[in-house]
C-alpha cells in the first residue's frame, strides 16, 4: 500500500493584536496570539485516507523565528501571501495508512512531521525571518463533511462555540447560561442530572448510595459476576477502563447492568444490556496504565428515566481545580483486606489532588492522561472492583461532569497513595470520535477474530489477552501455554560453548557458539537481516526487515557463525508467521519490532541458545558495554557480507545526547549505542540482530534490536536500536497467544493493547511503585526475570545456627501443623536438608519436566506460593507438586496434581505487592512424617525484629549458578520495616518484609520463589512468616530478600481454605 500524504497548511488568520500573555477573544475567522518574535497561527491538517474517510484537524501552533507585523491581518498583504503558500508547499510529510487515526496519534505524528521538516535549517521567509520551530498548542477535530476547512480554533482554555466564537469564561458548557451566540454551549445538556434523587446532602465517604443517586453508574458483568464499573455517556455507549478487558475480551461475554443500586440487580429499574463492541484507546499502555479508557457499545439504546441517565462529558477545556470535592461510586471491595463486594452501591467524596504532588507520591509515573483524587491520609478511595467507574464533579448548574475513570492505585485508601483516574478532559475527543464512528472502530474490537494473512492492517484484529494489576479484580489466565517454551534462567543468555567468555572489544570474527542466539534470515541464499532467539519457537527481528519480504520464502539459519553454514551445529528452519508491532511506523522506524514464530521448535544445544528477555523496568545504564553481532556490511558502502559472524562492543549512550546528535527527538522505544567518535557500529544487513548486555557473569540480556542509523560508524552518529524493555509486554503477549490457524506463513500486524507478562515471575525493586526496579531479581527459575537475575547461594557463611527449640506442642489452629518430626539438624548456612526436615516444603514442576518454583503446604489440599510464578503459565494443568522429598528430581516424593490456582486479587504484577497465590490440589495429601503442613500465623504483630528464621528451597546456590540438587536451608534474620525501606526506599509495602543480613551472603535466590520463610515459636511450632518473593540479585550487601508477609494476607487465605 502506498503511503498517503498529509498536507499541512499553516494559514494566518486576522486577529486583533493583544498583549503577549493575554488570551485572545476570537470570532468566526480569527485566531492568534501575538508576542514579540512569535506568531500564533492555525494549522489546518487534511488527512486523506485510502478508505476515502477524511478528517480535518485545526491546530494552533506557535511559529518561532519569524516576526509578527500587523500586515498579517490582511490576506492581501505580501507577508500573508508569502507565509501561507510557503507553508503549504513545504510542510508535507508521509503517513503509513492506518485503519483509523486517533486524536492522540494524529497529534503525535503531526508534531513529528513538522519537526522533521524544520530539523535542518528551518523554513526561510526572506525578509520576514526563518521559521525555526512550530509547536502545537491546541486542537479541534471533526469529520471533514461537518467542518469548514478554514474554521478558526480558540486558544488556550477558551471554549470553542459551534460557530467558532471563543468564550473565555471558565466551564461555560451546560451552566444554564447561553454564552455562545449560537447557543452551542447549552446544547446536548440532558446529562448529569439525578431526577430520582431529592436529598443531595453532603457526602462524606463510605456510605451506601440511594436509588437513582448515580443514574449513570453501570455494573459490568462477566459470567454473571460484577467485574468492573462503567458510566453511561449516551443511550448506546458506556465508558470504562481499558484494563478491565485485558483478560476477557469477547464483548458477547459482557452484560451491563444499569439503573441498579443493588448488586443483585433485583430492582424493577434495573436494565440488563448486552455489549456488542468494546473499543480500547489505541494508545492504551498496560505497562503504565496510560490512556486507560475504553468505550462499550450496547446492542440497543437504553431507556432513559429517573434511574438511568447519562453523565456529562466535559469539554477539553473544562477545568477541575485541585481541592475540588468530587464523588466516586461503585461496588468494589469495602476494605483492602475484606474481599467481599457490597450488595448496595457505595459512594464517597474525594478531593482532586495537585498533579505535581501526586506525581511525587507515585515516583513521577503520572502522565497528563491521569488525575489523582483522595486524601493524603488515606481512608477514602476506590478499590478493586471499582475499575472503570466514574469520578464525577458537580458544577453550579447541578449537573455532574465525568472528571475521571477509576484506573489504578497502590492498595486501597492507604496513606499517601491516592487513587489514580483516567483524566477525561484529555480523552474526551477520542471518546466522542469512537462513539460517533461505531461502524468503523478506532481501536480493535474485542470480538475474537484470527488475524488475516496479509501485510495490511487487519480490519478486525484480535487483541491479545493478558492480566494487569490495577483496580479490576484479577482473574486466572485461561490461555493454554503448552505449546510455548520460554527459556528458564539457566537456559537463557548463557554461552555453553564458550568456556571463558572473553571481553568483547569490537570488530572481531565470532566463533560458533559465541553468540548462540544469533540468527541469519535468508531469502534463498541471500542474507538480508539478522534475528535473535528468545524461545524455542520464537525469534525477534526488526519490523522494517519485512517491508518487502515474502514470509514463505524466508528461512532462519542458526547454530553456526558461518554465513555458509560451516561448523557448529547449523540448522535451517522456516517461519510459521511474522507479527509486526501494531504501532510500527516505517517513516520514523518507531516500534520497529517483529516477532517471528518458527515452523517447528528448536533443540537447544551449545550452539543454539536463547538470549534473556529483560523486564520492562530493567535499566541498561549509560556507558554499559554491550555486544552487537551480525553478518552485515563491514564498512559503509561495501555491500560484501562477511563469511564469518562479526561481533563488537558498544556503549549505551544517553538518550538526550543521542536525540541532540540526530536533531530528532528519539522515542521511548529507541535506545542508542556506539561511540561518539564512531568506528564501531552495526551496518546494513545487521538489522534485526541483537544488542546484548552481560548482566551477570556469562548471562546476556537483550537490550535492543538493530534498527537504524545514519551511515555506519560515522562520528557522532551512533546506532539506534529498538528498546526491548518498552516492548517486552507485547512480545510476551504474542508468544503467549494461541497460534493462529494459518496454512501459509503470514505477516500480521496485530492491533492490540498488551501488557507485559514476565516469563519468570516479575521482580520489583524499582523507581516507581507501579513498576519494579532495575536489577530486581525474580526468584523464579525458568525464564529471564530481571537485569540482575542472578542468584546467590543460600549459604550462610559463618552465621550463628538457628537455636534448637523444645519439642513441639499440639496446636488448635491446624492439628499437627508446624511440626518437624524428623531429626532437625543445626543450621550452619547453605547446608543440604535431610528427609522430613522441612515436611511442608513443596517443589512445583512445570509440565512435569522441571522445578520452577517452591510452595508451602498449609492444609491437606492447599499450597501457598508466589503469585508471580504463574504470570505466564497460569493454567493449573501445567503444574504438578512434589512433596515429601528433599531431592530436586522428585525421587521418593509424593506427586500431586494442581486443580486450581488463585492469585490474590490485589496482586500487582509490577510492584509485586500481594505476591501470593493459593494452589488447590486435586485431592488431599497423604500425611506422614515426611509430609505435613506448616502453621499459618495469627493476624497479629510480626515477630520481633532480629528474629532468626529459616528459608528453604532448591534455588541457585550462587548468583548466576545452577539449581541445587538437594533442598537447601539457611538461617536469616528478620529486618525491621525501617531498615527494609532504607534498602528499598520506594517499593516496600505493608505486605512485605525483609530478611537476611545487611552484609549479604545469605539469601534466597532464583528458583526459591514461593518457598517458605519459617519462624519457630517458643512452643516449638513452625509458623509461616513469609513467602519468598523478590530481591536485588542474591545475597548482595544492603539488598536483603523480600518476602510476602503472610499475616497480612491471612484473612484472604482463610476465605479459601477451611482449617
From Swiss-Prot:
Compositionally biased intervals (Polar residues): 780-798
Annotated catalytic residues: 243, 292, 387, 544, 592, 687
Residues that span the membrane, as ranges: 30-50
SMART domains xref list: LDLa, Tryp_SPc
Subcellular location as annotated: Cell membrane
Expression sites (tissue/organ): Expressed in fetal human tissues, such as kidney, liver, lung and brain, and in a variety of tumor cell lines. Weakly expressed in adult tissues including skeletal muscle, liver, placenta and heart.
Keyword Repeat assigned: yes
Cytoplasmic face residues: 1-29
Protein name: Transmembrane protease serine 9
UniProt organism field: Homo sapiens
Taxonomic lineage from the root: Eukaryota, Metazoa, Chordata, Craniata, Vertebrata
